[in-house]
A protein has these predicted regions:
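Active-site phosphate/ATP/adenylate-binding loop shared across adenylate-forming ligases
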Residues: 1-180
């Protein structure tokens, strides 16, 4: 991958991210984990992501989607990550504002959607209609505020790899011993 490639393309994060300063301590904040992560990303990551932090951290969902659509449709997005239902709302908003028929008309280099939080199957056909590329890649993650548990690590397989070395304790109990 060349340096020019990294500068020219963007990753789009679609998430509900809200953060609030602590009224008792101006140096501490509380809010969604994704918002805290966004606010603490290294500066160089901001070069490769869209939308800008001020939009990503907006509280009001309708205004946020509108501003995200306007800001991101001018970028050359190659990958998207987010919850499928929220991402569909944004993609449809972008199509409505742009007058285009599908997302590949706006982002011809889009090739990857990393999704999680919900079952993707009910949304898959909608994504295929919005992004009619036979080479579009869809990968699932399984994470929560408590940690990152699994990732789909193989193309063409819905199986996920359990992340055993991420500082999470797992205890596996045989089904026969559950009621003991």
């Amino acid at each position: 991958v060349s340096f020019i490639f990294l500068i020219d393309y963007k990753m789009l994060k679609v998430e509900w991210s809200s953060i609030t300063s602590n009224s008792f301590n101006n140096d501490s904040f509380y809010g969604d984990l994704s918002a805290i992560l966004i606010q603490n990303l290294p500066f160089w990551i901001q070069l490769f992501r869209t939308p800008e932090i001020s939009i990503a951290l907006m509280d009001e969902w309708e205004e946020k989607i509108e501003r995200m659509a306007i800001a991101t449709m001018r970028e050359d997005v190659t990958n998207i990550s987010g919850v499928p239902s929220w991402t569909l709302v944004l993609l449809n908003k972008i199509l409505n504002l742009s007058g285009k028929q599908n997302i590949t008309e706006i982002w011809p280099n889009l090739e990857l959607f990393i999704h999680g939080a919900v079952n993707f199957q009910p949304y898959k056909e909608q994504f295929r209609k919005l992004i009619p590329r036979t080479d579009m890649n869809y990968y699932e993650t399984y994470n929560a505020s408590e940690g990152f548990f699994g990732i789909q690590d193989r193309h063409g397989s819905d199986e996920m790899l359990l992340m055993l070395d991420y500082g999470i304790f797992y205890e596996f109990i045989p089904v026969a011993q559950l009621n003991r």
